[in-house]
């Protein structure tokens, strides 16, 4: 029930997760679901505690990227970067490594390190013309970082590539591309303006070779890895908006 409601009604999902915790707090799947429900409601301190509990129960490393993103949500991008440089990252599958790269780039941006964020996102997965579940989000994040750095032409190119790969509409890349092109969309049912709506163009596909080596944040850019189990559940800090 929690998983079904997270996207449609995150508040209701969170309420269900609290009930589930009261009934089965020793079940790892319940702790993980509670973590995602709290995460969806930006209750990052609570989410981090639940993810840590689930990981202790199972030893599963898959939650590592979202745990790092919780650190970002709590205003601790340095800790997120610590986690990006930890040995656990090499144990993640390809999707997990891409997710970790996205989190690390976000942490760099939190610290106003735009150039470092751009470099962090540059990877074989970004350049590949193979479309994977993570491709649209990776290209979108790269385009957004380029735009924030004032590199508008490059940003437009990568928003176009994100549009090409966004088969399920997981990003608003088409809207961002249209905005850069000066295109204004109107309501199709507005008879007075329907004939004036131009059509946005989509740029060319990316092309590059793929590589399979795992990515880990450069050791020079991160501090010594901390053991997440050293920190017990903390009173919830003010979450990032």
Regions found by a protein language model. Give the residues of each.
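Structural register within alpha-helical repeat arrays
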Residues: 1, 33-34, 67, 104, ...
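Alpha-helical segment of the N-proximal tetratricopeptide repeat
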Residues: 1-22, 33, 39
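Residue-level signature for tetratricopeptide repeat
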Residues: 4-5, 37, 68-70, 107, ...
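Structural motif corresponding to the intra-repeat A-B loop/turn of tetratricopeptide repeats
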Residues: 6-8, 41, 74, 111, ...
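TPR-repeat structural position
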Residues: 10-11, 44, 77, 114, ...
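TPR alpha-solenoid repeat register
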Residues: 30, 63-64, 117, 172-173
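Intrinsically disordered, compositionally biased tail regions
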Residues: 208-241
